[in-house]
């Protein structure tokens, strides 16, 4: 049963797709700054399993309330890939990276996310894009890797490598999820992926939990709450609704705004420095992503 999940009153027409899509991107843009705050008091491993467990329990309730049909064996395998990418892989690797670099620095790598998603869509879907696609793909990656190498001499090569791996596995999860959503439904994909991971996340959460929660700051709790409720679940509801209302090709372009929004949040909320180099590389990556999307089919 593929139902529309209503957290807010739906907005009719193409405008609703753009509005819902923008809300989804705005929510995702706060993920890295919120993670940065949370890992001050929580370990990256506990933060990863805690956010997955909280979101997974909520997702299970939603699936039961809406009486969604269980996925078949093939879909379960695909959902496992989604879970490895966006439920475990990206959250864990990015949290580990943020122990070494600022959220503003890490957000530069998010500019590659649409590109890695497109690359895995090509590999998984067997598409044969225009040769210009690969030119933009290589150029965009060179911007980020080049900047990371230069900055890594004074920042942290470990953090850069972890963020690069995070973006790669997230791109795989996004591509597999987009492919699966055609048959399973949009919000149902992330919900089932969370539920599949739940039996592993909950026990692990108890094993790696802090020895005491008395010293945990309010900011860390807020960060955990944000990545659990918004980044892991609610953001996907708005995002997939926007894609359905306004079209994947059109509304999907809003993802290009995420690095700019993320840098703005890092600067205003965390008071992190956003250098001219960060902005330049982000703009360069976004232009390359836009070019790769144009020739991606």
Protein language model regions, located:
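Glycine-/small-residue-enriched transmembrane alpha-helix faces in small-molecule transporters
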Residues: 2-49, 92, 152-179, 200
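Juxtamembrane helix-entry segments on the extracytoplasmic side of multipass membrane proteins
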Residues: 13-18, 40-45, 49, 71-77, ...
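Juxtamembrane helix-loop-helix junctions in multi-pass membrane proteins
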Residues: 26-56, 102, 172-196, 210, ...
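Specific transmembrane alpha-helical segments of multi-pass solute transporters/efflux pumps
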Residues: 26-27, 31-32, 60-110, 146, ...
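Membrane-interface helix-cap regions at the ends of transmembrane helices
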Residues: 30, 34-37, 41, 55-72, ...
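Helix-helix packing/entry segments at the starts of transmembrane helices
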Residues: 49-50, 91, 105-112, 176-199, ...
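Transmembrane alpha-helical segments that form core, pore/gating elements
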Residues: 55, 59, 117-119, 123, ...
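Hydrophobic transmembrane alpha-helices of multi-pass small-molecule transport proteins
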Residues: 59, 80-82, 112, 120, ...
